[in-house]
Curated annotation (Swiss-Prot):
GTP binds at residues 226-231, 245-251, 270-273, 335-338, 358-360. Keywords: Cytoplasm, GTP-binding, Hydrolase, Magnesium, Metal-binding, Nucleotide-binding, Potassium, tRNA processing. SUPFAM superfamilies: P-loop containing nucleoside triphosphate hydrolases (SSF52540), TrmE connector domain (SSF116878). One of its GO terms (cellular component) is cytosol. GO terms for molecular function: GTP binding; GTPase activity; metal ion binding. Binds 1 potassium ion per subunit. This is tRNA modification GTPase MnmE. Exhibits a very high intrinsic GTPase hydrolysis rate. Involved in the addition of a carboxymethylaminomethyl (cmnm) group at the wobble position (U34) of certain tRNAs, forming tRNA-cmnm(5)s(2)U34. K(+) binds at residues 226, 245, 247, 250.
Length: 454
């Protein structure tokens, strides 16, 4: 589809509401105003007008806002019609606008895409619009707004600028080898490179925090039947999300709860008790449990403290530990401390965290909450943070790898040409975040995930 078309879409959620907004952007927006309103409203002023059908009869009446380009969200002429939020009324008005030549329904995210293409915002800011809409906590919303206002982009642009200056210095050393000063060995380039690496590490740390705020952590509760997995899910969720009985195998499918710990999203998954089951339904539930375990960020290995004194997971259930994916973090949770009389709290056992608690009474659950937050490195006190996506983390990691490779070339062989190439690749990776260097394929995937009307 052409970006020269004029596009229209409903900017408010579908369904009934007090207000319904249609947004129009493009060369024909002026014609839409003349046809539907009978006049062109004063720029950036609210005008209360009837919205007219083809025969001149009123379909609705409301507020019209006119934003002539380039001083608009998309950089094009933009008209917003704010009428009553009834689905029938909005549908009639939308059909009326689509009778005009050169006007079509917008694709999901096309308004934001046009804003990006017209340099009204960069790609990280455009993504922040969707993240702000999807924010699941106050902290996530504030961080998304910071990204929208350019906080993340400013940090990335600072790195790109520093790399640009460093590349100039390195390439000057390559192009003018006969100068009296040996630019590659006088220590200045190494010092500048170390400075960029340190700045990039700081941005990566903040980006990981932003990714946690956006993506959250997937925690799977696993263990034998009747270990108290569902009771722990209920304790963490603060409500009776799962049925709890003394009958082994009560939970036969995956149960999911979404909670927040000091702003960090946590996806808690309760699974069927793991054992050799003859019942077909229970067997399917156990297989699904293993599928969830394999995709987890952390596993809470639930142990009934009344059945064993062991604390090392390899001693408690070696077959379970052997089947777990390599490098998957495990927290051993010894449950039923209210019965065993164990001291509540957290300790380390052979590289694994061990938490003693009572899921039934809730004693020790706060210790587990703090452990989950700390295990992901989540900092609740970070001010002015920004949200980050997985593609951002990947781009930052690639840039860091190129800088380390470049440093190795500099220190190992004084290879200026190879250092210059690694600096170029690092700069390219960073530019993918803001969209200065991005494939059309990636743009399509990003903007297609947006709401229609955004």
């Amino acid at each position: 589809m052409s970006h020269n078309d004029t596009i229209v879409a409903q900017a408010t959620p579908p369904g009934r509401g007090g207000v319904g907004i249609l947004r129009i952007s493009g060369l024909k927006a002026r014609d839409v105003a003349q046809e539907v309103l009978g006049k062109l409203p004063k720029p950036r002023h609210a005008d209360y007008l009837p919205f007219k059908d083809v025969d001149g009869s009123a379909l609705d009446q409301g507020i019209a806002l006119w934003f002539p380009g380039p001083n608009s969200f998309t950089g094009e002429d933009v008209l917003e019609l704010q009428g009553h939020g009834g689905p029938v009324i909005l549908d009639l008005l939308l059909k009326r606008i689509l009778t005009l030549p050169g006007v079509r329904i917008a694709r999901p995210g096309e308004f934001s895409e046009r804003a990006f293409l017209n340099d009204k915002l960069d790609l990280a800011q455009a993504e922040a619009i969707a993240d702000l809409i999807d924010a699941s906590s106050e902290q996530a919303a504030r961080s998304a707004l910071n990204s929208l206002q350019g906080a993340f982009s400013a940090r990335v642009n600072h790195l790109v600028e520093a790399l640009t200056h460093l590349r100039i210095y390195v390439e000057a050393a390559i192009d003018f080898p006969d100068e009296e000063i040996d630019f590659l060995s006088d220590g200045k380039i190494e010092a500048q490179l170390n400075g960029v690496i340190a700045d990039l590490d700081a941005v990566r740390t903040e980006a990981r925090q932003g990714s946690l705020l956006r993506e959250g952590m997937k925690v799977v509760i696993a263990g034998r039947p009747n270990a108290g997995k569902s009771s722990l899910l209920n304790a963490l969720a603060g409500r009776e999300a799962a049925i709890v009985t003394d009958i082994a195998g009560t939970t036969r499918d995956v149960l999911r709860e979404h909670i927040h710990i000091d702003g960090m999203p946590l996806h808690i998954i309760d699974t069927a008790g793991l054992r050799d089951a003859s019942d077909e339904v229970e067997r399917i539930g156990i297989e699904r449990a293993w599928q969830e375990i394999e995709q987890a960020d952390r596993v809470l290995f639930m142990v009934d403290g009344t059945t064993t004194d062991a604390v090392d997971p390899a001693d408690i259930w070696p077959d379970f530990i052997a089947r777990l994916p390599k490098n998957l973090p495990i927290t051993v949770v010894r449950n039923k401390a209210d019965i065993t009389g164990e001291t509540l709290g957290i300790s380390e056992v052979n590289g694994h965290s061990l938490v003693r608690l009572s899921a039934r009474t809730g004693e020790g659950v706060d210790v587990l909450r703090n452990h989950l937050k700390q295990s992901m490195g989540f900092d609740t006190n970070m001010e002015g943070g920004f949200l980050a996506r997985r593609r951002h983390l990947q781009a930052l990691a690639e840039a860091a790898e190129h800088l380390e490779q470049g440093k190795a070339q500099l220190l190992g062989a004084w290879a200026g040409e190879l250092l210059a190439e690694e600096l170029r690749l690092a700069q390219q990776s960073l530019s993918e975040i803001t969209g200065e260097f991005t494939s059309d394929d990636l743009l399509g995937r990003i903007f297609s995930s947006f709401c229609i009307g955004k």
